[in-house]
Amino acid sequence: MARSQLERGLAIVELLFGHVLDGLENKEICRRLEESPVNICRDLDLLKKSKWVKQTPTGGWVLTERPVALLKVFQVYQQKYHERMTSYAARTDAQAQQMIR
């Protein structure tokens, strides 16, 4: 079954996450995703316009800092959520202790 452009774009991003520093050539992306060069070129162009990938001086493709920064945003959110939950647990524990007395 053929994948949609969105599915191919996400597959490219996932693939390039494993090659953040060195990137991959178009031909290698096509081979690994078993997609035609036409589709991959189209998808890479869209990802480039969206600032998710960029071309290296040697012609390969790498992720920009954007998707990596989004991952960092998620990690910061998780940390803040954990801190809030820890604070909430401490407050409810203290209130429960007062109720027991």
Residue ranges of predicted features:
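N-terminal helix-turn-helix
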Residues: 4-68
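Amphipathic alpha-helical dimerization/coiled-coil segments
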Residues: 76-101
